[in-house]
Curated annotation (Swiss-Prot):
GO CC entries: cytosol; endosome; nucleus; retromer complex
InterPro entries hit by this protein: Calcineurin-like_PHP_lpxH, Metallo-depent_PP-like, Phosphodiesterase_MJ0936/Vps29, Vps29
Encoding gene per record: vps29
Family stated for the protein in its record: Belongs to the VPS29 family.
Identification of the protein by name: Vacuolar protein sorting-associated protein 29
Role of this protein: Plays a role in vesicular protein sorting. Required for the endosome-to-Golgi retrieval of the vacuolar protein sorting receptor pep1/vps10. Component of the membrane-associated retromer complex which is essential in endosome-to-Golgi retrograde transport. The vps29-vps26-vps35 subcomplex may be involved in cargo selection.
Subcellular location: Cytoplasm; Nucleus
């Protein structure tokens, strides 16, 4: 089962559109579920995601003002309990310790979070944390590292029992690069 984890679009206020290179990869019928971590900021992005896959889980981002979406959600895939949130209410934002507390509160084996616009994947305290980054490469206005360029990215998760295979898609110098990672649930 392939699950697309994507977010932080900020279309049209910070980015004009999703890259055509990414659009060519996101083919309807190939993805079983989408988990969107918010900050769509336009209904056209929501409609596009629903076109790619009708099974769309969505949480509200800091800039989704009219969204009725929840701020967090939880699903089970294989043997994993997966929590997901935009991350804008985590204080301090992107703090591994604060995210670890949230994962424990959600009783999650995997915590998906957004908000920083930068891809991240790491294990801490028996939980695996994944931030898919910004799908459009939209700048993060609250980031301290203003000169750091945001790389457009998203991830595909393939859950096989107690193993998560993560495919990280990023655009570098106009070309899509894919990195494969694996996480095994501790016994």
């Amino acid at each position: 089962m392939l699950v697309l984890v994507i977010g932080d679009f900020h279309i049209p206020d910070r980015a004009p559109k999703l890259s055509e290179k990414f659009r060519q990869l996101l083919i309807p019928g190939k993805i079983s579920q989408i988990i969107c971590l918010g900050n769509l900021t336009s209904t056209s992005v929501y409609e596009y995601l629903k076109h790619v896959c009708s099974d769309l889980k969505l949480v509200k981002g800091a800039f989704d003002i009219s969204s009725k979406a929840p701020i967090a959600g939880k699903i089970t895939l294989g043997s994993f309990k997966i929590g997901y949130t935009n991350g804008h209410l985590v204080v301090p934002q992107d703090s591994p310790e604060a995210l670890s507390i949230l994962a424990r509160e959600m009783d999650a084996d995997i915590l998906l979070f957004g908000g920083t616009h930068k891809f991240a994947a790491y294990e801490l305290d028996g939980c695996f944390f994944v931030n898919p980054g910004s799908a459009t490469g939209a700048p993060n206005v609250s980031a301290v590292e203003d000169d750091e360029k945001i790389v457009p990215s998203f991830v595909l998760m393939d859950v096989q029992g107690a193993v998560l295979i993560l495919y990280v898609y990023r655009i570098f110098d106009g070309e899509v690069r894919v990195e494969k990672m694996q996480y095994r649930k501790p016994e």
